[in-house]
Design a protein with these regions (language model features):
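Short, basic/hydrophobic alpha-helical segments
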Residues: 76, 80-88, 197-200, 248-267
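Acidic beta-strand-to-loop metal/phosphate-binding motif
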Residues: 90-97, 209, 266-274, 572
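Short Gly/Ser/Thr- and Asp/Glu-enriched loop/turn motifs at secondary-structure junctions
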Residues: 51-52, 293-295, 392, 429-433, ...
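Conserved catalytic core of nucleic-acid polymerases
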Residues: 376-379, 383, 455, 505, ...
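Polymerase palm active-site segment centered on the conserved acidic dipeptide of motif C
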Residues: 397-426, 430-431, 435-437, 698-715, ...
Length: 849
């Protein structure tokens, strides 16, 4: 199937090869007339090109990749190549797996068949999309892209699809390849060349791009790349092919010069994810890197927070270089060194290529500059870590195991005989006792779909994940299903405890990153620090990362996080109301000021909801609360005491207040009643068990006073008009996943509703961290911090100070947290409150003012 151009374009000559014709194409005997073709047509037209101006055809006649090499398909591909040669396009757009395999079979290889790739062929469209490569035996310039049908299935790829279509249209204006000449003469330098290069950088102080290869293990950095432009750079090998590259005295001189350059605050530096370079250099080699002025990952994230942020993606969008990241694992020494050279020069080019677009969005530029200023204290926290009390941690683990044993006894007493009769039980050893395994998918499937008789989803099949079990529990309220869910949650808690792995110095670390969420929130994951994993014989099996996500540490476990010694206090300060202030300002701007007035009066909306709920439960009119004067309402909410400890059912005594807070946040973001019920159930390990109807009452009462639904409607209108959300803090997000401006998908709407509150809260917290870090009065004569930050948790900071600095530190914390925002014309200063104690959990002593 082929369609030749009927309206030749005066400058562009593009051939488009799809995967294979679908039903609509076969019915009409015309390429690209189905839904995927319509998506392609829209994107081409947006770039000034019509499908009638292109050669349109397919790489295969069928969807099967398994029959690729049979005689019929081979004959078809010969015909295809002949047609392309005859048309002689300036560029060929390869859409999807079949097209890439037809143009570059050398890039494809056999692998083990999987559900995602049943043919057993690995065709790396994900890697090569956006790349400009020679194809069809080198005769034609090609651009690789996802097929429009794949994009429709995974619509999060629409942003990359748009970029790649634009690239193909641009490249169809000329036969020329856009490759740039780069001087890689110094990827395996001599000692003299290395010293000359480093000396010149030290003395002339050019802006440099930095990239390291290696890990913070027993070897450390294996090669260190430095570029002085997008075209020139040096790669300094240290450990190549299992051996040292330099003599000992030579390496000492090189490291000394490198350390001088890296610590020089007058030498501007850029990187792709500077946090890794800083951590490995400081942790493994005790080398400080100062004055990172740019970061290609952070800049790219600022412009397109929804897109992948790895260097492969960054290079594919901001340069015209083809995919190269697989060269990292090559066994060829020169290719491996060349890979590091590409990293540093491509990073340099990509970072500078973003400047024109960044200049077009001044607020985004300001936010990016702020994040670059924030990077040093983030790196400090990544390195510093926090002391962990191992005895307390063990006590928590023992308690969790005991509770899990209790759940197991309850489950086995009800299910064991039936499960045994159904022959679904397994055990590792014959000597092991029989037990129902709540980790086993097979056994949970039996429980849900055989024993309890639920009907599997027609679309997803017999799933057993947490949300599925919660959904069935919502329907049945079956007590044994609840116990199984509680056991699963307790296993998760136990796993969380086991992930709190310390480094040899007794401190736990995390890896904070500014670019891992779509809302500019700090992300936390396992630390970049590594320790050896030993086998039974005492030999090192491999090196593994320590630490974990510390933002999800439960309140119960926070007593394990302690200051360095008894001479220090642990402190925490968090924003009061946090995300709610942005919602309140939005509603006030829309003409619904109740929430903002409450916040300004020091009234917490969750406490107001508790009062309204009490009226409802007493069968009185909850609207009475809404009619109260603001001062009377403040007296009532101030008199509400939130209990501590556990109630008679084992629930947190504050569960009702927690439910009101969950209702506030979920309803602000267009969450539904069942979402609130599920959140509370999960957080409490099944102890707080509101029905959907009960959660709906909470929501109804909340809306009765604050009207958050009108903010949701306004956000939907903004998305329909612009497709973007601009936050007061400067962060901007374009929602590529919107299929139409006429309709906003509910999930996108919920994401957009939470975006600015989370971004603003994070921004204000980060402002406090920046104020703390750069305040000269917070430094000793040696440069050490009087008030140290250890942890960042969305709307809070925590750390330590010496007890002698307690009064001074309290005043300073309040000062650092005083930051103003203008949200839709309304000036807002989010108040902060906190305390200090002998652990993170016990920061209950009020901060002095």
């Amino acid at each position: 199937m082929i369609q030749h151009p009927t309206l030749p374009h005066p400058t562009n000559k593009l051939a488009i090869i799809g995967e294979y014709p679908r039903k609509e194409e076969l019915a009409h005997r015309k390429p690209f007339v189905g839904s995927g073709g319509r998506l392609l047509t829209i994107e081409l037209q947006a770039r000034g090109l019509a499908t009638e101006q292109c050669l349109l055809t397919y790489a295969s006649q069928t969807s099967s990749l398994s029959s690729w090499d049979n005689a019929t398909n081979a004959t078809y591909r010969d015909w295809l190549m002949s047609e392309i040669d005859t048309y002689s396009p300036n560029c060929v757009l390869l859409l999807g797996q079949h097209a890439l395999r037809a143009a570059r079979p050398d890039l494809c290889y056999r692998t083990r068949p999987t559900k995602a790739s049943p043919s057993g062929w690995r065709i790396p469209v994900d890697n090569f999309r956006g790349s400009i490569i020679p194809g069809f035996d080198g005769r034609h310039k090609c651009v690789v892209c996802y097929s429009p049908e794949d994009v429709q299935r995974v619509y999060t790829n629409i942003g990359l699809f748009k970029f790649d279509i634009a690239r193909a249209v641009s490249e169809s204006k000329s036969l020329d390849y856009p490759y740039k000449s780069r001087d890689d003469s110094y990827i395996k330098p001599t000692f003299v060349e290395t010293i000359e290069w480093l000396t010149r950088i030290r003395d002339q102080k050019p802006k440099i791009s930095v990239d390291i290869e290696g890990y913070p293990d027993d070897i450390g950095i294996t090669m260190f790349g430095i570029a002085i432009s997008p075209y020139q750079g040096i790669v300094i090998p240290f450990w190549i092919d299992g051996d040292n590259y330099w003599q000992h005295d030579e390496e000492v001189q090189i490291w000394s010069l490198l350390a001088t350059i890296m610590a020089d605050g007058d030498i501007a530096k850029t990187a792709q994810n500077l946090f890794y370079e800083q951590f490995v250099c400081m942790w493994r080699h005790r080398m400080v890197i100062a004055n990172f002025t740019e970061d290609s990952m952070m800049k790219h994230y600022e412009l397109f927070p929804e897109l992948p942020k790895g260097l492969g993606t960054v290079v594919s969008i901001w340069t015209k270089e083809s995919y190269y990241k697989d060269e990292r694992t090559t066994s060829d020494t020169r290719t491996k060194l060349g890979y590091n050279f590409k990293d540093i020069t491509y990073t340099y080019e990509a970072e500078e290529a973003m400047d024109p677009m960044m200049d077009a969005y001044p607020k985004s530029s300001d936010h990016y500059r702020f994040n670059m200023k924030l990077a040093p204290p983030i790196s400090f926290m990544n390195i510093r870590g926090c002391r962990l009390d191992q005895d307390r941690l063990k006590a928590h683990k023992d308690a969790a195991e005991s509770e899990l044993d209790d759940y197991q006894l309850k489950i086995d007493s009800v299910l064991l005989d039936a499960a045994h009769a159904a022959d679904v039980l397994t055990r590792k050893r014959k000597s092991d006792p029989w037990a129902f395994n709540v980790k086993s998918t097979k056994q949970k499937q039996w429980l849900l779909y055989n024993h309890l008789g639920f009907k599997p989803s027609a679309r997803w099949g017999p799933k057993t994940d947490d949300s599925t079990m919660l959904r069935y529990y919502e329907k049945s309220r079956d007590p044994i299903l609840r116990t199984v869910i509680q056991a699963v949650r307790k296993r998760t808690r136990l796993s969380d405890i086991e992930k709190l792995r310390c480094d040899p110095d007794g401190r736990i670390r995390t890896s904070l990153n500014l670019c891992d969420t779509g809302t500019s929130r700090l992300a936390s994951r396992e630390s970049m620090a590594m320790v050896p994993l030993l086998g039974k014989d005492g030999n090192v099996l491999k090196w593994v990362n320590t630490g974990t996500n510390l933002q999800n540490v439960t309140k119960e476990l926070r007593d394990c996080f302690v200051p360095d010694t008894e001479d220090y206090d642990f402190w925490q300060l968090d924003l009061e109301g946090a995300d709610g202030w942005t919602v309140a300002a939005d509603l006030a701007a829309l003409g619904y000021p109740a929430m903002l007035e409450d916040y300004l009066a020091g009234i917490k909306p969750a406490k107001v909801l508790m009062l309204m709920l009490a009226e409802y439960e007493a069968k009185r009119d909850p609207m009475v609360i809404n009619k109260l004067p603001i001062q009377e309402l403040k007296k009532l909410t101030s008199a509400l005491v939130i209990p501590e400890g556990r109630d008679s059912q084992g629930r947190s005594a504050s569960w009702k207040y927690d439910a009101c807070k969950a209702t506030q946040h979920a309803t602000n973001y267009d969450g539904k009643a069942e979402t609130i019920s599920a959140i509370l159930f999960k957080r409490s390990d099944g102890l707080v068990d509101l029905t959907k109807a009960e959660a709906g009452i909470y929501q109804y009462l909340y809306k009765l006073r604050y009207n958050p639904q009108y903010r949701t409607e306004w956000i939907a209108d903004v998305l329909k008009e612009t497709g973007c959300i601009q936050t007061a803090i400067g962060f901007r997000r374009k929602f590529f996943g919107m299929r139409s401006r006429a309709y906003v998908d509910p999930q996108i709407l919920r994401t957009a509703a939470s975006l600015e509150p989370q971004a603003n809260t994070t921004g204000v917290t980060n402002m406090a961290l920046v104020n703390m870090w750069y305040d000269p009065t917070n430094r000793s004569s040696t440069g050490w911090l009087h008030v140290e930050p250890f942890l960042a948790i969305h709307d809070a900071l925590a750390g330590q100070w010496h007890k002698s600095n307690r009064e001074w530190g309290c005043k300073k914390l309040h000062h650092w947290f005083q930051n103003n925002l203008r949200i839709h014309g309304i000036d807002v200063s989010i108040p902060a409150d906190g305390g200090w104690g002998d652990s993170w959990k016990t920061t209950i002593n009020p901060l002095l003012t």
